[in-house]
From Swiss-Prot:
Membrane-topology annotation of the record: Multi-pass membrane protein
Stated name of the protein: Olfactory receptor 4F17
Extracellular side: 1-18, 73-93, 152-188, 252-262
Lineage: Eukaryota, Metazoa, Chordata, Craniata, Vertebrata
InterPro entries: GPCR_Rhodpsn (IPR000276), GPCR_Rhodpsn_7TM (IPR017452), Olfact_rcpt (IPR000725), Olfactory_Receptors (IPR050427)
Organism this protein belongs to: Homo sapiens
Membrane topology, Cytoplasmic segments: 43-50, 114-132, 213-228, 283-305
Keyword Nucleus: no
Similarity comment: Belongs to the G-protein coupled receptor 1 family.
Key word Cell membrane present: yes
One of the Pfam families matching this protein, by short name: 7tm_4
Amino acid sequence: MVTEFIFLGLSDSQGLQTFLFMLFFVFYGGIVFGNLLIVITVVSDSHLHSPMYFLLANLSLIDLSLSSVTAPKMITDFFSQRKVISFKGCLVQIFLLHFFGGSEMVILIAMGFDRYIAICKPLHYTTIMCGNACVGIMAVAWGIGFLHSVSQLAFAVHLPFCGPNEVDSFYCDLPRVIKLACTDTYRLDIMVIANSGVLTVCSFVLLIISYTIILMTIQHRPLDKSSKALSTLTAHITVVLLFFGPCVFIYAWPFPIKSLDKFLAVFYSVITPLLNPIIYTLRNKDMKTAIRQLRKWDAHSSVKF
């Protein structure tokens, strides 16, 4: 019986691994700094105490958590002779990846719904997107994330692993792990696509439809009134594409390509959480103003101290 899995990682070259260590160390530092900056800014600035920024702060927390499931181990493994993870540790990675990933899908859908109400039904916005609704959305997000991760774990936990234990990646995920099972996994592959793949594609299509409706609504408004809404909407759409693009190929595409899978795995777990804070900060005047105010407050506090 297999008690551990060996990651093949991103490269066998020692020189390249040193470069990758420095690169991803900087990237992960940027992920921690950028996402925590958004959370602290939203919490500390009363002007940002609105449903959109509440959801944005929670999205940043989930991005940070999702990246932290894989990035720290990947970084430390660059200097390890054997990149090993225990069987239980592998299952924990699968659970957490799908827990945070499923929760993020719900939050992205909620953010799309929030923009739809704000732009298409502005008179009903405060009634629909009230405080209780925001708390309810987060409860649903965590609940769906939990149910989704449990269903994913159920696919793998009872599989027999008695032969190869090399995972051609830098973290454990269900599509890669089930290929190592000592049994026919064709039906299981179909079930994984039916679960994660259908959930991903349906969520993505729903968001594309909602943002298309919003864009059509904005087109009929005067330019001066639509510019701010369009700027915010562009940031949302960019983040949706960055998150769902890799997910569709990883979980819904029936013909995986190993080299592409590794690139998409890096993009999904590192690049997207790194870019999201940059996108929301650069495309949002309120966020940029709040961050400047936070810096002034920090500088003023330092002088007083």
